[in-house]
Regions:
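C-terminal or mid-to-C-terminal helical accessory/interaction module adjacent to the motor/catalytic core
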Residues: 143-144, 188-275, 330
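Metal- or metallocofactor-binding catalytic centers and their adjacent structured scaffolds
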Residues: 295-338
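Intrinsic low-complexity, disordered N-terminal segments enriched in polar/charged/small residues
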Residues: 8-10, 34
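Intrinsically disordered, low-complexity regulatory segments
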Residues: 34-213, 217-221, 354, 424, ...
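Hydrophobic, low-acid, alpha-helix-prone terminal segments
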Residues: 19-25
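Basic, low-complexity terminal or inter-domain segments flanking catalytic cores
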Residues: 39, 43-46, 130, 141, ...
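Glycine-centered, phosphate/nucleic-acid-interacting loop/turn motifs that mediate DNA/RNA or nucleotide
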Residues: 367-368, 589
Length: 885
C-alpha cells in the first residue's frame, strides 16, 4: 500500500523499459542485423500506415514491386494482402499513456496528498474508441508468417510515437524498417520503398517522440491537478487545465490583454491638406521635419501634434497659401516570399488555423496534389531540382490558370526573367528538417471551392519563387509653405516580377499610392485644410494569424541565442499542433473568438495570474518550450540521452507541485484587510476577511459567508455590494459540480444565506450542489449507479447529462400541482417508475387524475403511465350505457 502523501507509482507489463533507468536500452524493438535483413524475403512483410486512406494508397502504389493486393475483411477491419506483404493501418493514435491510480487502487483523487504523480515506469493503455482496431493490427503483427514490420505512419515525431506505442503494448519483437514518405504520389511512395530506413537510423527520433509524450504527460497532468486543487480548496471542483505549450501561449495572449485593459488613450491632432496643381489634386499630411525617433516615447510620430492650439495655428497660417513642391524618386525591389511551411500557410489562408490544416491534409492525403503539409521548413533539398522541374512541367501542361507562368519558368534563362535556379532561399539542406516545404506534386484533382483557394496559394507561391523581384518606383513629395511641410507618398509598379503570377501589371498604382504628376519647381495651392482630432489606439488583439506568428517566433522573447534558434524553427509547439493548441484554449474557455479577434476570458487571466503568483516561469514564458525543443533536437541528432532529459522533467514537475502546495499553505495564513461594510446580520461595523470567508467580528454574531462560490472568487467590491444591497450581479464565471460554466446573480436572503438568482425561470439549471443536499445513491435499471440531490425546486442527477440538460437531468419537485416526495423520486430513478400517485391536476381540463410517473434516463423525459381501471366499474358503466340505449 502506498503511504498517504507519497508520489503515485504505476506498475508496467514485462518487457517495457524504465525511461529513467540508466541501464535501460534506448529502443524496445531489436535492431535488424545483417542476418535478419537477409531473412526478410523468406516471410511476409507487415506494413502499418497511420490512416486507412494511406493504407489504400500504399496497396495501389506497392502493387508494382510486390504484386496486386487483395482486399480482406469488411468495414473497419479491412486490410490488404498478397504473397509478399500485408498492409494495415491505425486510425491515428491507438494507444495512450495510462492514467495513474491512487493509493487505494481506485482513480487518482484530486488532492495535493497524491501529487506529484510520477510513474516509476510508464504504462500504456488502448484508447477505448480504437481498441478494436488495435487488436486487429496486433493480430496481424503476431502472425507467424510475418517476419518484418515496416512503419509507414506519417514521417515525423508523432508517426514514430504511434507506431512504437503499438509495438510496445503488443510486445512485438520483430525487425522493423521505416518507410519515410515526403508525398503521397505513387512515384514518391515507390522511391521511399526503395530506400527504407533502418530502426537504428530512427532510434534518436523515436526517443525524442517518447520524451515529448512523457514530458507533456507529466507536466500537464501534475500542473492541471495542482492548480485544480488550489482553486478548489474552498469547495466545488474548479478544474484548471495547464500544459507545456498551452499555458505559455495563453500567457502571450494574457500579456496583450493586460496591455489593452491598462491602456489609456492620449489625444493628438493631425493637419491634412488638399493641394491643387495643373494636373489635378493630391493630399498631404503635415510633418515635423526635425522629428527624430525616440525609443523612450513610442507614441511620438512626425505627423502627431499634442496640443490643439499648435494644430490650429498651422491650419490658420497655411489656409489659402501656396507651397513649393519638391520630389524624390527611389527604386525599390521586393523579392518573392519563400515557399510555404504549415504555419505560414495557416496565417495567410483565409480560414481558421484548424480549418486550414484540415484543408491542407485533404489536399495531401485525399487528393495527393501537395506534399506533406505538417512541415516547419520553407526550403527544398539541394538535390530536388529535377523533381521541381518535373512538377513545373506537369503544371505547365495542365489546364490551370497559372500554367502559362510555369511555362515561362521552364523557358527562362537570364536572371531578369523567370527561370529555374538553385537559390539558397529555395534549396538548402541545412534548413530542411523532417520534411521540406509545401509544394504541389503536379497532379490535378477536382477540388471544392475552399480546397481550390488553398491549393491555388501553394501553386502560385511555388511558381513565384522562381520569378525575379518586383520593382517599384517610390515617390516622396514634400510641399513647403514657409516653415510648414506637408508630406505625400506614392508608389508605382515598374516591373511586376513575381507579382505577375498574382495578376499585377506594370505602370499601375493602387488608389492611395497614385499621385498626379507635377513639373519641376511647380507651385501647389492649398485648396482645403483641416485639423483632425485623433486618439492613440490600444495594441490590437491577436487574431489566429498573428497568434500563429507569435507562437512560431516566440524566440524573440528569449535572450539565449541557442534557445532562440530552436524556437525560430519550432516556436511554441510545432506547426502540426499549434491549431489544436488554439482550439484547446477556446474549448477550455480560456480564450474566445470575437469575429477575427481572440479575447482572453476571466478564467484565462486568472490562470496566468495564478502561475505568476506561484513563480512558475516555465508555464508563463516561452523559455521552457525553447529549452525543451532545443534538447529534443539534440536528442534527435543523438547528442542527448533520453534518461538525462527525463530527469530534468521530473525535477521540474516536482517544482510545479511544490510551489502550488506552498501557495495553498501560505494562503491559509495570509492576512486580509477588513471589508468596510456593516454586518448584514447584527449591523456591527466591518467584516473580517480570511482566505476562505467574510465573517462578523462580534463574538456573539454568527454571520459568515464564503468568498468562493461555485468555483468563483467573490471580489471585495462584489461582496460589499451583496452585503449592503442584498443582491449583486449577474456575475459570470461560476462552475457547476461537473465543471459546467454558468452565469447568475447572488442574493442574501432573510436567513442571511447566499443564493443564486437566474434571469430565466429555470432557477436550478446550474445549481451548485453539496453533499448536504444528497438524498441517495441508487442503481438504475441499466446497472449504473448515480447520486440524486435535491434543491429547493427540483431533484438533480448531475451524472446524467443530455444536450438539453448539460448540467444534469432534473426532476421538478412539483408536477401538475402535486408534490413529488424524495422517496418517490428515488424509486423513479431506480426502477423507472413510481407508485401510483393520486391527485395530479390536468392543466388543460383542470380535472384530477391518478398515474405512475415514468422516467427515461436517456433524455430525462418524464411521462405518465395510467393504471388499469377496476373491471367491475367498467362493467357497470357498460351496463348502464346499454340500459340508456
Amino acid at each position: 500500500m502506498t503511504p498517504r502523501g507519497s508520489p503515485v507509482h504505476m506498475q508496467i507489463s514485462p518487457g517495457f523499459r524504465n525511461p529513467l533507468a540508466k541501464s535501460a536500452r534506448t529502443s524496445l524493438v531489436p535492431q535488424p542485423t545483417p542476418a535478419t535483413r537477409a531473412a526478410f524475403t523468406m516471410g511476409k512483410t507487415l506494413i502499418i500506415a497511420e490512416k486507412p486512406s494511406v493504407m489504400t494508397d500504399l496497396s495501389r502504389a506497392l502493387a508494382k514491386p510486390l504484386g496486386k493486393f487483395e482486399k480482406t475483411g469488411s468495414g473497419r477491419d479491412i486490410y490488404y494482402e498478397n504473397d509478399q506483404a500485408v498492409i494495415t493501418s491505425a486510425v491515428g493514435h491507438l494507444v495512450e499513456l495510462r492514467m495513474p491510480m491512487g493509493p487505494n487502487g481506485k482513480k487518482l483523487p484530486w488532492n495535493f496528498q497524491v501529487l506529484p504523480a510520477i510513474p516509476e515506469r510508464f504504462e500504456l493503455d488502448p484508447i477505448p474508441d480504437s481498441e478494436a482496431r488495435l487488436k486487429q493490427v496486433l493480430k496481424l503483427a503476431k502472425r507467424k508468417d510475418i517476419d518484418r514490420i515496416v512503419n509507414a505512419c506519417d514521417a515525423g515525431r508523432e508517426g514514430e510515437l504511434i507506431f512504437h506505442y503499438i509495438m510496445e503494448i503488443g510486445n512485438i519483437r520483430k525487425p522493423v524498417q521505416r518507410l519515410w514518405m515526403q508525398s503521397m504520389t505513387n512515384n514518391a511512395i515507390l522511391e521511399a520503398w526503395q530506400s527504407l530506413r533502418s530502426e537504428e537510423q530512427m532510434k534518436a527520433l523515436t526517443d525524442a517522440a517518447k520524451c515529448r509524450s512523457e514530458s507533456d504527460w507529466l507536466v500537464g497532468l501534475n500542473a492541471t491537478r495542482a492548480f485544480t486543487c488550489f482553486n478548489s480548496r474552498h469547495g466545488g471542483f474548479n478544474i484548471t487545465a495547464a500544459g507545456r505549450v498551452q499555458t505559455p501561449t495563453l500567457a502571450i495572449l494574457a500579456a496583450r490583454e493586460a496591455e489593452i485593459q491598462a491602456f489609456k488613450p492620449t489625444p493628438y491632432f493631425e493637419v491634412h491638406a488638399t493641394f491643387g496643381v495643373r494636373s489635378g489634386q493630391y493630399p498631404g499630411k503635415w510633418i515635423d521635419e526635425s522629428w527624430k525617433k525616440d525609443e523612450s516615447n513610442p507614441l511620438s510620430k512626425p505627423e502627431r501634434i499634442w496640443d490643439q492650439a499648435t494644430a490650429d495655428a498651422i491650419r490658420s497660417r497655411c489656409e489659402g497659401k501656396t507651397g513649393v513642391v519638391t520630389e524624390e524618386k527611389k527604386s525599390q525591389s521586393q523579392i518573392a516570399p519563400q515557399l510555404y511551411d504549415l504555419t505560414t500557410l495557416q496565417r495567410e489562408a483565409p480560414f481558421s488555423a484548424k480549418g486550414n490544416l484540415q484543408i491542407a491534409q485533404a489536399l495531401y492525403e485525399k487528393h495527393k496534389v501537395i506534399t506533406y503539409p505538417r512541415t516547419d521548413s520553407r526550403y527544398l533539398p539541394e538535390d530536388y531540382t529535377a523533381n521541381v522541374r518535373e512538377t513545373m512541367r506537369e503544371i505547365a501542361d495542365s489546364d490551370l490558370e497559372v500554367s502559362r507562368y510555369a511555362k515561362a519558368v521552364l523557358a527562362g534563362g537570364p536572371d531578369h526573367v523567370p527561370h529555374l535556379h538553385k537559390s539558397r532561399r529555395i534549396f538548402d539542406n541545412k534548413k530542411v528538417s523532417d520534411h521540406f516545404a509545401i509544394i504541389p506534386t503536379g497532379k490535378t484533382a477536382k477540388l471544392s471551392d475552399t480546397e481550390q483557394k488553398v491549393y491555388d496559394m501553394i501553386v502560385k507561391r511555388f511558381i513565384a519563387v522562381f520569378y525575379p523581384s518586383a520593382e517599384f518606383e517610390q515617390t516622396t513629395r514634400l510641399t513647403r509653405i514657409l516653415q510648414d511641410t506637408f508630406k505625400t507618398e506614392g508608389r508605382i509598379l515598374v516591373k511586376p516580377g513575381w507579382l505577375e503570377v498574382y495578376g499585377r501589371r506594370p505602370g499601375v498604382a493602387s488608389g492611395k499610392d497614385e499621385l498626379v504628376p507635377v513639373t519641376a519647381g511647380e507651385s501647389a495651392s492649398v485648396e482645403h485644410i483641416e485639423v483632425l482630432h485623433e486618439e492613440t489606439k490600444p495594441p490590437a488583439r491577436f487574431t489566429e494569424s498573428t497568434l500563429l506568428s507569435a507562437m512560431e517566433g516566440a524566440g524573440k522573447l528569449i535572450d539565449d541565442e541557442a534557445l532562440a534558434e530552436a524556437m525560430a524553427e519550432r516556436g511554441l509547439g510545432t506547426p502540426a499542433t499549434r491549431a489544436a493548441t488554439i482550439e484547446g484554449l477556446i474549448a477550455q474557455k480560456y480564450i474566445a473568438r470575437d469575429g477575427r479577434d481572440l479575447h482572453v476570458t476571466g478564467s484565462g487571466m486568472r490562470l496566468i495570474q495564478l502561475v505568476r503568483e506561484m513563480d512558475i516561469e516555465g508555464l508563463y514564458s516561452p523559455k521552457m518550450t525553447g529549452d525543451w525543443e532545443y534538447k529534443l533536437r539534440q536528442m534527435e541528432h543523438g547528442q542527448l540521452r533520453r534518461d538525462a532529459f527525463m530527469k530534468e522533467i521530473i525535477s521540474y514537475t516536482n517544482e510545479i507541485v511544490s510551489k502550488a502546495r506552498k501557495l495553498a499553505e501560505d494562503a491559509k495564513n495570509q492576512s486580509f484587510p477588513d471589508l468596510n461594510v456593516p454586518c448584514p446580520m447584527c449591523g456591527a461595523k466591518g467584516l473580517r476577511q480570511t482566505d476562505a470567508t467574510y465573517e462578523c467580528r462580534q463574538p456573539d454574531c454568527k454571520f459568515k459567508a464564503k468568498k468562493h462560490i461555485a468555483g468563483r472568487l467573490l471580489t471585495e467590491a462584489e461582496a460589499a455590494e451583496l452585503f449592503t444591497k442584498k443582491f449583486v450581479g449577474p456575475l459570470t464565471g461560476f462552475k457547476s459540480k461537473f465543471n459546467k460554466p454558468f452565469d447568475a446573480g447572488l442574493e442574501l436572503d432573510a436567513k442571511f444565506k447566499v443564493n443564486f438568482v437566474f434571469d430565466n425561470d429555470d432557477k436550478d439549471a446550474a445549481v451548485e450542489l453539496t453533499e448536504e443536499q444528497l438524498i441517495g445513491e441508487v442503481e438504475m435499471p441499466d446497472g449504473r449507479r448515480v447520486k440524486v440531490y435535491q434543491s429547493e425546486k427540483a431533484y438533480h442527477i448531475p451524472e446524467l447529462v443530455t444536450k438539453k440538460e448539460p448540467n444534469g437531468i432534473r426532476i421538478g419537485k412539483s408536477i401538475l400541482h402535486h408534490e413529488i416526495t424524495a422517496e418517490q423520486a428515488l424509486k423513479l430513478v431506480t426502477t423507472g417508475k413510481t407508485d401510483v400517485i393520486k391527485g395530479f391536476v390536468s392543466n388543460r381540463t383542470k380535472r384530477k387524475f391518478d398515474a405512475h410517473l415514468t422516467f427515461d434516463p436517456k433524455d430525462g423525459k418524464i411521462g405518465f403511465d395510467f393504471p388499469p381501471r377496476p373491471a367491475k366499474k367498467a362493467a357497470a358503466k357498460k351496463a348502464a350505457k346499454s340500459a340508456d340505449g
